[in-house]
């Protein structure tokens, strides 16, 4: 039986408790949908010291080009307070036209719809005019070390090449058809630490309060703005995400303070140029002494996250026009091409082929009572099916 019904496909996937790093049966369920319609599937377990082993799936139909990849993940975030859910989070319960369950939107729903779209395409037209592959990881919501990165490396090493990729992440803010993601901002994280001298709060002259120093440095990171944005990207933005002193006593000046930060940056910067700018800001602030009158310049240490994400923008007309045309044909609206939001595994795929993202409405992702409208599943399946036909026509032209 062809898996042409996205509702049935999604219910099967939701019932698999695949909270990162557990496979939970989700990849097995997906494989059982794909093999009857002609896909050959491989299961790859990726490993790295200090991280959980992760099971991934790569499935392909066809042997020649053009080659379209669909990428995504079956792992989901924890359910949170299960008692707060209206329906059990892995039950795939349907109520008032919506299916409830962890991963319904992010992003088992997108996978279920693309499976249905491919099955419908094959049922109507036979095998695709080239190849279609599914690159599905169980490590997107986690560290993202043993997932898409290693699956791409494995596939490329065995000779796989792709002409384009669609990632099925939820991209629409309020309704299906609003937004296609054609790029992503870069992401850079770090932590600065300042050593002080611990002492009694009543005798500050005998101590050196590192909180003053860390506030001075943190302010310099956030102000002034890094830029005003570009044609395709919003302004780069730095947020201080934690300030920690490890001190529970109200009458003790702490011995050290640290602050973590994250920058989402546009195409005016690279990770390297942004690091240089941040260090320059910290150096200037360290010598200013505004919050530390009469004290020596602040001495700080900075540690960078080992894996910054680089900014990218996809400019592949065949891919973008095929998808935007499919969205307009099915929904009647022209989607906005956007680079907003957080990072996704598209940041890894961009090094192998042009990539865009389009999926469900993301309003309830990661929330209690994550859910998707059944009508949206049918609409997205229709868009995906139309896109598949249009993309192969474009690619063959």
Curated annotation (Swiss-Prot):
Keywords: Amino-acid biosynthesis, Cobalt, Diaminopimelate biosynthesis, Hydrolase, Lysine biosynthesis, Metal-binding, Zinc. Binds 2 Zn(2+) or Co(2+) ions per subunit. It catalyses: N-succinyl-(2S,6S)-2,6-diaminopimelate + H2O = (2S,6S)-2,6-diaminopimelate + succinate. Its cofactor is Zn(2+); Co(2+). Zn(2+) 1 binds at residues 73, 106, 169. GO terms for molecular function: acetylornithine deacetylase activity; cobalt ion binding; succinyl-diaminopimelate desuccinylase activity; zinc ion binding. GO terms for biological process: diaminopimelate biosynthetic process; L-arginine biosynthetic process; lysine biosynthetic process via diaminopimelate. Gene3D superfamilies: 3.30.70.360, Zn peptidases. It comes from the Bacteria. InterPro entries: ArgE/DapE_CS (IPR001261), Bact_exopeptidase_dim_dom (IPR036264), DapE_proteobac (IPR005941), Peptidase_M20 (IPR002933), Peptidase_M20_dimer (IPR011650), Peptidase_M20A (IPR050072). CDD domains: M20_DapE_proteobac. Its EC number is 3.5.1.18. NCBIfam families: dapE_proteo, PRK13009.1. Catalyzes the hydrolysis of N-succinyl-L,L-diaminopimelic acid (SDAP), forming succinate and LL-2,6-diaminopimelate (DAP), an intermediate involved in the bacterial biosynthesis of lysine and meso-diaminopimelic acid, an essential component of bacterial cell walls. Belongs to the peptidase M20A family. DapE subfamily. This is Succinyl-diaminopimelate desuccinylase. It comes from Sinorhizobium medicae (strain WSM419). The gene is dapE.
């Amino acid at each position: 039986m062809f898996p042409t019904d996205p509702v049935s496909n999604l219910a099967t996937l939701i019932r698999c408790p695949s909270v990162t790093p557990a496979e939970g049966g989700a990849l097995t369920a997906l494989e059982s949908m794909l093999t009857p319609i002609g896909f050959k599937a491989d299961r790859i377990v990726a490993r790295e010291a200090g991280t959980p082993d992760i099971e991934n799936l790569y499935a392909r139909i066809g042997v020649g080009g053009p080659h379209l990849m669909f990428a995504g993940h079956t792992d989901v975030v924890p359910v949170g307070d299960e008692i707060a859910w209206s329906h059990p989070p892995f039950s795939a319960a349907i109520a008032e036209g919506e299916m409830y369950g962890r991963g319904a939107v992010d992003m088992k729903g997108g996978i279920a719809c693309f499976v249905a779209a491919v099955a419908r395409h094959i049922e109507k037209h036979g095998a695709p005019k080239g190849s279609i592959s599914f690159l599905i990881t169980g490590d997107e919501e986690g560290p993202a070390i043993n997932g898409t990165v290693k699956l791409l490396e494995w596939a490329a090493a065995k000779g796989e090449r792709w002409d384009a990729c669609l990632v099925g992440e939820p991209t629409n803010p309020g309704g299906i058809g609003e937004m296609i993601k054609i790029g992503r901002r870069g992401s850079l994280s770090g932590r600065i630490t300042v050593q002080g001298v611990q002492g009694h709060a009543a005798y500050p002259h005998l101590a050196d309060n590192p909180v003053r120093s860390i506030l001075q440095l943190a302010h310099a990171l956030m102000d002034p703005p890094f830029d005003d944005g570009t044609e395709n990207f919003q302004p780069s933005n730095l947020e201080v995400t934690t300030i920690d002193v490890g001190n529970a006593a109200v009458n003790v000046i702490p011995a050290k303070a640290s602050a973590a930060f994250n920058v989402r940056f546009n195409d005016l910067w690279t990770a390297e140029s942004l690091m240089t700018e941040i260090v320059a800001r910290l150096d200037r602030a360290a010598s200013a002494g505004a919050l530390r009158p009469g004290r020596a310049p602040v001495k700080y240490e900075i540690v960078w996250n080992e894996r910054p994400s680089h900014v990218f923008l996809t400019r592949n007309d065949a891919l973008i026009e095929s998808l935007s045309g499919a969205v307009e044909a099915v929904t009647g609206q022209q989607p906005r091409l956007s680079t907003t939001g957080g990072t996704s595994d598209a940041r890894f795929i961009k090094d192998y082929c042009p990539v865009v993202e389009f999926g469900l409405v993301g309003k309830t992702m990661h929330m209690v009572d994550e859910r998707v409208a059944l009508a949206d599943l049918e609409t997205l399946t229709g868009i995906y099916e139309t896109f598949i036909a249009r993309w192969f026509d474009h690619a063959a032209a």
